[in-house]
């Protein structure tokens, strides 16, 4: 019985973290939420139950990203979990999103990666994308985090490297002076 109660408590804690993250991304407490009723997960959109098959691919990806960050904190105190060393790999975080959700996701990533990268100076993060706008947003985000890390830890700036995959080879990305319009042509 104690084990079952502990599992249910873990479910409530995880859902609390996921729902807090969903609220952060959607800028609303009711836009999208997950509830646990009668041993089942229920998706709520604007307070009304919705079938998983009826939500968009973007919403599914958002749930996956929120679950990813919540699962890292599983069975840990949130206050100390960020002080551990991590390697965070995030693959194309804003695919399938409209502009409003892209803004929410990038803001959420800045918030979460800030907690991890500033929580332990040895934590590393890799973001992969095929979208140049996401790349430029990520570059700005990492620039801000590098400055915050320099203030917090002092000394040399953290290393920030940019690469692109070209002809199956990973090469340094020539980011200076590169324009998205030129790339699209």
Kindly give the residue locations of the regions a language model identified.
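Walker B catalytic motif
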Residues: 88-93, 98
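Conserved D-loop-proximal element of ABC-family nucleotide-binding domains
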Residues: 83, 96-99, 103
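C-terminal lobe/lid and adjacent interdomain/linker elements of RecA-like ASCE P-loop ATPase modules
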Residues: 104-185
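Extended helical coiled-coil dimerization/tether regions that scaffold
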Residues: 1-55, 70-87
């Amino acid at each position: 019985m104690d084990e079952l109660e502990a599992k249910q408590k873990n479910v409530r804690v995880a859902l609390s973290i996921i729902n807090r993250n969903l609220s952060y991304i959607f800028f609303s407490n009711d836009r999208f939420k997950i509830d646990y009723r009668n041993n089942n997960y229920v998706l709520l959109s604007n307070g009304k139950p919705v079938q998983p098959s009826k939500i968009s691919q973007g919403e599914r990806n958002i749930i996956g990203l929120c679950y990813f960050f919540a699962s890292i904190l599983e069975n840990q105190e949130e206050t100390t979990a960020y002080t551990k060393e991590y390697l965070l790999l995030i693959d194309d975080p804003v695919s399938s999103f409209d502009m409003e959700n892209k803004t929410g996701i990038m803001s959420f990533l800045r918030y979460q990666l800030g907690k991890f990268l500033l929580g332990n100076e040895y934590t590393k993060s890799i973001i992969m994308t095929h979208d140049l706008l996401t790349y430029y947003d990520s570059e700005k985000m990492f620039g801000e985090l590098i400055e915050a890390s320099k203030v917090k830890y002092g000394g040399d700036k953290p290393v920030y490297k940019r690469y692109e995959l070209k002809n199956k080879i990973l090469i340094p990305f020539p980011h200076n002076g590169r324009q998205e319009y030129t790339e699209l042509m």
